[in-house]
Swiss-Prot record:
Biological source species: Agelena orientalis
InterPro entries to which the protein is assigned, alphabetical: Spidertoxin (IPR004169)
Maturation-removed propeptide residues: 20-45
Protein name: U8-agatoxin-Ao1a
Signal peptide residues on this chain, from the entry's feature table: 1-19
Subcellular location: Secreted
Tissue distribution: Expressed by the venom gland.
Membrane-spanning ranges: none
Amino acid sequence: MKSLLFVTIAVYFVAQAVTANLLSNFLGSSLIDDDKGNMHKLYKRSEDQCIGRSCTCDTSSTSCCPYAACRCNLWKTSCKCQRTGRKWATPCKEIYSPN
């Protein structure tokens, strides 16, 4: 019984591998290249986003928008992006995209 189950699972995985190989040969490698490009665009978009002023931030990253810095109280809690210098930062939005 165990050997029959093992053979069934092995045949299933071989069939999946053959189907995937035939499908990739039929469609070409353009789908794989497109996926890599799309993932790069998604990663780039997440880099462009920042946290607006007066919103909660994390001190371990530079996630605040330009002209804002992540500042915490004495006990390193309730950290928020606050204005730096004389220039004004963006209004509070949880995720702000400058582009």
